[in-house]
Amino acid sequence: MKADIHPDYHMIKVVMTDGTEYETRSTWGKEGDTLNLDIDPNSHPAWTGGQQTLVDRGGRLSKFKKRYEGLGI
């Protein structure tokens, strides 16, 4: 394996949508960071069989709806 070409691999904490926390090794963030999941196997419709809900991350969905609200579609 070549030296100094791979990202740092360290421990992070992952928090699922139901509040469950676990630690895993990852290249995301830095040592000790917390990754809060928006969607996980406990809440994703593909695994739960439930209704699909739209997650408006960053206001993109709201911006789209506002832009095209006058079309009446």
Curated annotation (Swiss-Prot):
Keywords assigned: Ribonucleoprotein, Ribosomal protein, RNA-binding, rRNA-binding
Top-rank lineage group of the source organism: Bacteria
GO molecular function, one term: rRNA binding
Example of a GO cellular component annotation carried by this entry: ribosome
Keyword S-adenosyl-L-methionine: no
InterPro entries to which the protein is assigned, alphabetical: Ribosomal_bL28/bL31-like_sf, Ribosomal_bL31, Ribosomal_bL31_A, Ribosomal_bL31_sf
Example GO biological process: translation
A Pfam family of this chain: Ribosomal_L31
Family classification: Belongs to the bacterial ribosomal protein bL31 family. Type A subfamily.
Function: Binds the 23S rRNA.
Subunit structure: Part of the 50S ribosomal subunit.
Protein name: Large ribosomal subunit protein bL31
Organism from which the protein derives: Chelativorans sp. (strain BNC1)
